[in-house]
């Protein structure tokens, strides 16, 4: 590097000398001395620069060496740290598994305690529910159906659908006739004889209701007519026959009235019934050909007291009735005979289908438009192909409650 600097100095001298004026005898020694001195200063500066550069290079080499040593140490430390972190991760994982196991044991104990508590609550609720049902159905009625003894055709009309009945509670001889499945006219006859003979006096009293009924599921209970309002899917009307006004109304909950109650009764969506325990509603559950739902209604306030999902299907059913708190469902094939009871439901569970004989109705050519039980005279009132029929029943005592 020094040789290069000196060569550069010589070239610089030659370059500057080329521009100097011609030598003069008196000035040449002084000028040469001046230039020489300046070049010496320049050489000294270049020498210092060279020394500084060498020192920098040496320091940089030492620094690089130190960095290499430190990087080697870092790699060693990194390996040690990786090993330590790996061991720590294994310990944390082991500790987490132990914590999860302890938590599982705690949750298992809590779950067992919760299940025991839930089971105890369910048993208590079931006991209270059973007590409530027994209290609700605690009437002086312990009969069960054993057979249909005979039938009596009381009257013949041209209308295929309709209903007829007496008051289920009041000791009144009056007979009520409701013609058709959608109407608002009630005919009131003084007694059964006046109903049977057209020309008998007094003549029937005609009453036009302010609302029309739907289906053939009407009942007379304590002087009130209960029926399904035609203008709605699930409204029950309580009509005061004496005052000729709507006394009260209610909506059955749960989507009631969207499907037919019975497959072979094409106009009845809610079938009302009366027995020794009071007022009931029979309707279909959700779905096509679903099971029947039994609902107990408090007739005074029109409040729902309880509902039961029964095992009885609406498919192939044509009618049903209640006797002493037990639901009896009448079935037929394609709407033709024989008409028989093949499904019953007892909310108290005292009787089942195995306890009953084969229950057949006397053969009729068509399905029943309605069959209603009257707890006062213990008979069935039915409508079949325009015939108003009374069925006499054979009963026996139920088994005692356990």
From Swiss-Prot:
Organism per entry: Homo sapiens (Human)
An example Gene Ontology CC term for this record: extracellular space
Protein's name according to its UniProt entry: Olfactomedin-like protein 1
Post-translational modifications: Highly N-glycosylated.
Keywords from the UniProt entry: Coiled coil, Disulfide bond, Glycoprotein, Secreted, Signal
Disulfide bonds: 141-324
Olfactomedin-like domain residues: 140-397
Organism taxonomic ancestry: Eukaryota, Metazoa, Chordata, Craniata, Vertebrata
Expression across tissues: Mainly expressed in the small intestine, liver, lung and heart.
């Amino acid at each position: 590097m020094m040789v290069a600097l000196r060569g550069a100095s010589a070239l610089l001298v030659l370059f500057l000398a080329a521009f100097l004026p011609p030598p003069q005898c008196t000035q040449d020694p002084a000028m040469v001395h001046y230039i020489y001195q300046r070049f010496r200063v320049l050489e000294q500066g270049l020498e210092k620069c060279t020394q500084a550069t060498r020192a920098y290079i040496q320091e940089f080499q030492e620094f690089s060496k130190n960095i290499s040593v430190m990087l080697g140490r870092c790699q060693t430390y990194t390996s040690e740290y990786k090993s330590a972190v790996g061991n720590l991760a294994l310990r944390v994982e082991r500790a987490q598994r132990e914590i999860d196991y302890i938590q599982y044991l705690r949750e298992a104990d809590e779950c067992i305690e919760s299940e025991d508590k839930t089971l105890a609550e369910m048993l208590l609720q079931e006991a209270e529910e059973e007590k409530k049902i027994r209290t609700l159905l605690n009437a002086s009625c312990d009969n069960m159906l054993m057979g249909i003894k005979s039938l009596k055709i009381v009257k013949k009309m041209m209308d295929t659908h309709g209903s007829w009945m007496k008051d289920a509670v009041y000791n009144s001889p009056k007979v009520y006739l409701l013609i058709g499945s959608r109407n608002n006219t009630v005919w009131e006859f003084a007694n059964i004889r006046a109903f049977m003979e057209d020309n008998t006096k007094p003549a029937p009293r005609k009453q036009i209701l302010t609302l029309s009924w739907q289906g053939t599921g009407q009942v007379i209970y304590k002087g009130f007519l209960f029926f399904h309002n035609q203008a709605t899917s699930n409204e029950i009307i309580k009509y005061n026959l004496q005052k000729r006004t709507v006394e009260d109304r209610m909506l059955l909950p749960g989507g009631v009235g969207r499907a037919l109650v019975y497959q072979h009764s094409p106009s009845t969506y809610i079938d009302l019934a009366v027995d020794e325990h009071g007022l009931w509603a029979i309707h279909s559950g959700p779905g096509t050909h679903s099971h029947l739902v039994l609902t107990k209604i408090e007739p005074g306030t029109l409040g729902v007291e309880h509902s039961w999902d029964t095992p009885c299907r609406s498919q192939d059913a044509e009618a049903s009735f209640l006797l002493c708190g037990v639901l009896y469902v009448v079935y037929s094939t394609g709407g033709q005979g024989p008409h028989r009871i093949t499904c019953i439901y007892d909310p108290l569970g005292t009787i089942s289908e195995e306890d009953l004989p084969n229950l057949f109705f006397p053969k009729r050519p068509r399905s029943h438009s309605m069959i209603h039980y009257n707890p006062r005279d213990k008979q069935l009132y039915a409508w079949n192909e325009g015939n108003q029929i009374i069925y006499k029943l054979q009963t026996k005592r139920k088994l005692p409650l356990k």
